[in-house]
């Protein structure tokens, strides 16, 4: 009897031991239009409007920073539960961790947002839904 219980316990625990069933999906963000390899790419995913659209002003955004290695890059966010999200990217050319803007708030460094809306970013035009794995494309814009 003990052997049957031990075998059952092992078989039942096998998916967890192998890492199967990790909650949430993977968001793959394909970024294009990066004008040079100076600095780094800051990519973030917002689950709510708090701090949107600036990664650094949000306490709830998931942020990744990567060294730029070409005109296009791919960033992955894992373990995202189903729901509404907005993704944002910034080309931090001087690597200071801040988005440079002019005196009226227009970015001096490259920026991009999910759904690639023109003009001032709005949550409604940038939001997308995830129900598992998803891939989006963001084009970096420089003004």
PLM regions and their residue ranges:
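Short solvent-exposed loop/turn micro-motifs enriched in small/polar/acidic residues
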Residues: 59, 70, 119-122
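Short amphipathic beta-strand segments in non-cytosolic proteins
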Residues: 45-63
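Short, flexible loop/turn segments at beta-strand junctions in immunoglobulin-like
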Residues: 77-80
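Short proline/glycine- and polar residue-rich coil/turn motifs
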Residues: 65-71, 129-130
């Amino acid at each position: 009897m003990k052997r049957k219980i031990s075998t059952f316990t092992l078989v039942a625990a096998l998916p967890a031991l192998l890492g199967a069933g990790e909650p949430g999906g993977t968001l793959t963000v394909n970024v294009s239009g990066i004008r040079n390899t100076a600095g780094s790419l800051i990519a973030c995913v917002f689950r709510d409007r708090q701090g949107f659209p600036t990664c650094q002003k949000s306490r709830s955004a998931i942020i990744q920073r990567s060294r730029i290695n070409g005109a296009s890059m791919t960033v992955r966010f894992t373990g995202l539960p189903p729901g509404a999200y907005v993704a944002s990217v910034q080309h931090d050319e001087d690597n200071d961790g801040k988005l440079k803007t002019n005196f009226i708030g227009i970015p001096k460094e490259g920026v991009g947002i999910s759904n690639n809306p023109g003009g001032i970013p709005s949550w409604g035009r940038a939001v997308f839904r995830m129900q598992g794995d998803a891939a989006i494309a963001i084009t970096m814009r420089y003004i």
